[in-house]
Amino acid sequence: MLCSHVAASQSLAELEKQLDSLLRKEEKSEVVLGVGYGNNPAYGSKTTNFELPIILKTFVSPSLSYYHKSGFYAGVSAYYLFNSLNKPWFEWDLTAGYDYTKNKNFLTGISYTHYEFTDSSDVPTTPITNELFAYFYYRKWWVQPGVSLDYGWGKDALEGNHTKETFRGNDFNFIAALRHPFIFNAVMSRRDVVLFTPSVNFTMGTANYYSNLKAFQYVTRSPKLKQVKKHPGKELNFEDHSNFEARAIDVTLNLSYFIGRLNLAPSFTVFKPFSGTEQNIMSYFTARMAYSF
């Protein structure tokens, strides 16, 4: 059981929009240049094999996004894997979405992401290349309840001399959350603001594939596909499925420090998996730095 590099915690866009809304800051359009840090599941050997151990390798993720004052946004990000055995730039993401933050009683939003993977033997392959993600938080109460829905789908084709193998896959996840944002003004200077958001999240869903879906804080090796005997001229289509079930509960601490146009956002998560072979309590750390224009 490992953690994926895309967490179910708040995105930078959501943190910024929530902070702007809470402080009733004047709405404006922005270009945001950012870089993230974290760990990604990767193979620990030069030979890709289902029996090899999966380890966590450090990555950095530069990104460029545009946020319109209406709530629409679009962005592109890339991922560079340190200590890679093959191509270090293993992934590119294209995202577009909409966040609605103008109502003081709730927050909601929806986004679509397309994932492009390079042919790297470092990271586990997946047919999941598209994602729809939606969230809703009711913030009239001191403790804010929220729900998120996450659906990913795609296919991956492998053509040989006499066969064409097509992997078709999808994953669906539901997240229930409780959180409360704390805002502190003028912590280190008169121009800075700190947003601290602890949350408790309960995740249910399928875990068919390694994936970068936003709900995939917890990655488990899916059951191995059955070996299919190849016949000349045949096109083989197959899928891999797991049940919709409770996957994990976590406590996440999001800290976001704003000073001028600069934002620093570390995050720490402790989680307890309910499925997979390893169900011990585990944790991971991610961080992000961004500058808005």
Which role fits each region the language model picked out?
Residues 280-293:
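Outer-membrane beta-barrel "beta-signal"
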Residues 9-34, 43-51, 189-191:
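Outer-membrane beta-barrel biogenesis signature
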Residues 62, 94-96, 132-134, 176-178, ...:
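Membrane-embedded beta-strands of outer-membrane beta-barrel proteins
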Residues 20-30, 101-108, 137-145, 182-197, ...:
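Short loop/turn motifs that connect adjacent beta-strands in outer-membrane beta-barrel proteins
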Residues 39-60, 76-84, 239-243:
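Surface-exposed strand-loop-strand hairpins of Gram-negative outer-membrane beta-barrel proteins
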Residues 150-265, 269-275, 291-293:
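Outer-membrane beta-barrel transmembrane domain signature
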Residues 32-38, 65, 75-79, 109-113, ...:
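Transmembrane beta-strands of outer-membrane beta-barrel proteins
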